[in-house]
Amino acid sequence: MSLLINSTTLGNIIITLGSVFLLYYLIRKFAWDQITGIFVAREKKIATDIDSAENARQEAEILVQKRQEELAAARTEATQIIDEAKKTGKTKESKIIAEAYDEAKRLKEKANQDIAQSWVEALAGVKGEVADLTVLLAEKVMKQNLDAKAQSDLIDSYLDQLGDA
């Protein structure tokens, strides 16, 4: 029996090996090119994807670099605009202060002229009133023959009337 088992086992091995070689030959003859084509296509696709990813990464780096340069340029421009606005503001501030100073000086001079004019007019008015009072006082003194005390009292009463008016 052992011989039978050994021969069956040997037969099974031979049939199995024959089947494997036949299957290998058939695959090699009919499907091997397609199978290797799939692997080659897959390899090419992976290589293309890697190249595309590398190109996309390089383009992204270039884009990042460009955006950083644009941002730096925008910051520089913003700084220049702010500096120009500050300069313009200081110039306008100085101009407004100078104009206000000139206006205040002009108003002060006009006020001084108005005061001087009012002073002259008031002085002329006082002179006229003093002259009128002097004439009036002289008339009254001439109408009355008064001694020194009566003249002094008369002058004082007219001055009091002048103070009340």
Swiss-Prot record:
Q: Which GO terms describe its molecular function?
A: proton-transporting ATP synthase activity, rotational mechanism; proton-transporting ATPase activity, rotational mechanism
Chief subcellular location equals: membrane
Keyword Signal carried by entry: no
Per the record, the domain of life is: Bacteria
Summarize the subunit comment.
F-type ATPases have 2 components, F(1) - the catalytic core - and F(0) - the membrane proton channel. F(1) has five subunits: alpha(3), beta(3), gamma(1), delta(1), epsilon(1). F(0) has three main subunits: a(1), b(2) and c(10-14). The alpha and beta chains form an alternating ring which encloses part of the gamma chain. F(1) is attached to F(0) by a central stalk formed by the gamma and epsilon chains, while a peripheral stalk is formed by the delta and b chains.
Q: What does this protein do?
A: F(1)F(0) ATP synthase produces ATP from ADP in the presence of a proton or sodium gradient. F-type ATPases consist of two structural domains, F(1) containing the extramembraneous catalytic core and F(0) containing the membrane proton channel, linked together by a central stalk and a peripheral stalk. During catalysis, ATP synthesis in the catalytic domain of F(1) is coupled via a rotary mechanism of the central stalk subunits to proton translocation.
The protein here is known as ATP synthase subunit b
Source organism (scientific name)? Streptococcus thermophilus (strain ATCC BAA-250 / LMG 18311)
